[in-house]
Amino acid sequence: MMEPRYQEIPSSESPTVEQDGVWVRVIAGECMGITSSIDTKIPITLIHVKMKPESRLVQQLQADLNGMIYVFGGGINLENETRVKKSPIAFGIGAKQGIQDGELALLSEGEEIVIKSQEGAEFLIFAGPELNEPIERYGPFVMNTKEEIHQAFSDYQNGTFVN
C-alpha cells in the first residue's frame, strides 16, 4: 500500500495557458506546453479546459492510461479515430463523436485526442493507470479491503494517518 500523503496546492499555483480560443488549467500532467506543479507518484492527467466556439485542442495521453472526458458546459466533438470504450450516454463509436453537457466519455487506448467545439465548451480530461485491484470505499477513504478501511479510520482518529 502506498503511504498516504497530502499536497496543498492553491488553484493560483496551478498553471494556466490560453491560445487560439482554448484556455486550460493543468492540475496534473501536461497540456499545451505547460506542466502541473504537483508531485504525483503515478502518472495521472487532470486538465480543466474551456473552449470558445470553433476552437480545437490536440491533447497527448499516454497510451497505457485510461482516459475520460466529462463535459459540464456546451459540447465537443472527438475529431480523430478516438473511440469510446463504454459510456452511459447514447452516441456511436467512431469519428466525430459528440459529447454534450453532463456526459462522460471513456476513451479507448490511444496517444492523441483531437477535440473541437462548435459552440464553446467546458470540460475535464482525466487519465490514469488501471488499478487492477479490488476497491473498498467508505466515507473519505478508498482502500482494497474492509480491514484497510478500519485501519485508516483508526489511524485518522489516533492522529497517525499522515506523517
Model region roles, listed by residue range:
Residues 1-163:
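Jelly-roll (double-stranded beta-helix
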